Amino acid sequence: MCQRILILGTGITGKSVARFLYQQGHYLIGADNSLESLISVDHLHDRLLMGASEFPENIDLVIRSPGIKPYHPWVEQAVSLKIPVVTDIQVALKTPEFQRYPSFGITGSNGKTTTTLFLTHLLNTLGIPAIAMGNIGLPILDHMGQPGVRVVEISSFQLATQEEHIPALSGSVFLNFSRNHLDYHRNLDAYFDAKLRIQKCLRQDKTFWVWEECSLGNSYQIYSEEIEEILDKGDALKPIYLHDRDNYCAAYALANEVGWVSPEGFLKAIRTFEKPAHRLEYLGKKDGVHYINDSKATTVTAVEKALMAVGKDVIVILGGKDKGGDFPALASVLSQTTKHVIAMGECRQTIADALSEKIPLTLSKDLQEAVSIAQTIAQEGDTVLLSPGCASFDQFQSFKERGAYFKLLIREMQAVR
């Protein structure tokens, strides 16, 4: 049946929604704050510039792009009119393909992408065809029609308006939780609640996995002595950071839902897995100083894990666009690992106010200046670590662009050999 569907946000996700639903014969109305974005979308029957248009009449369904906050006025208006509000995730989970093939959902404050990619790699290594999709940058609706296990990264942005129970996932994991995205969610409770809504996507009697310290009803912890013993036997493994162990444990638990995972297959997958860039990515050294790109660390918790992984004699570059991070909480781990903090970008003064009395700290207007300062301070044996603990949007389009620029700066000063 043809429906009048309002697509809120016409970026990457909105475009994929329009492509998919146009093939289903629906009447599609796109809405965005950017006229340029609206014009760039094919398959729309009508286009509305939010802020200059009224909420349209006779809408059957609203599909919210992740960038549209769950309390956006048009979302709230739809809710008041009892119009269902969903995201591309809920649209995809209702397709026959998510009943035909096993599928897994992965959420958490940190480690989602690494776990998604590793689980996909693990299954393929075991001879089980699998494809990664979702918040990983591969819109879920663009992968309809491909056979194989679905491994879906799902963000709190995509879950925040999940109301209906859609029994599609063969298993799901909530990797961890830390203070984050308070520039998006109304408060920490709303952020946590959004993450928990992944349970609404589980098939009946399927497993909901959580991190070791978490205690939630109807859930199982991803850590097990069995996995620890397997990892300890992997003598030929490259060093595994503690947080990556959690990611591997989660993938192991989920993979067991579709068949027994042999220790040999698990260890082979770890040996052959290439972690995505910008996650404790070692860039090399010059004059005995090591350089590490951890641009993906956009939360205080991620910075803590990075510092614990690197260990000591760290010169850490923090800063960017604040997401409500608890910077005073870094004081303890900084005192154990760090020689100097360089606070850069939009929230550099916020970081300085929180930490300057506890550890040597220098302010920097941008990443280029921060690298120059770090090069001046660093001595043989030190590690310069970009682990911002903030979003990148004060000066960059994404953490990837920020990380790529950091790598360029390091190459230009011939730090890598």
Curated annotation (Swiss-Prot):
Keyword Transcription regulation: no
Annotated metabolic or biological route of this protein: Cell wall biogenesis; peptidoglycan biosynthesis
Pfam families the record matches: Mur_ligase_C, Mur_ligase_M, MurD-like_N
Alphabetical keyword list: ATP-binding, Cell cycle, Cell division, Cell shape, Cell wall biogenesis/degradation, Cytoplasm, Ligase, Nucleotide-binding, Peptidoglycan synthesis
Substrates-to-products reaction catalysed: UDP-N-acetyl-alpha-D-muramoyl-L-alanine + D-glutamate + ATP = UDP-N-acetyl-alpha-D-muramoyl-L-alanyl-D-glutamate + ADP + phosphate + H(+)
HAMAP family: MurD (MF_00639)
Name this polypeptide is given: UDP-N-acetylmuramoylalanine--D-glutamate ligase
Source organism (scientific name): Chlamydia pneumoniae (Chlamydophila pneumoniae)
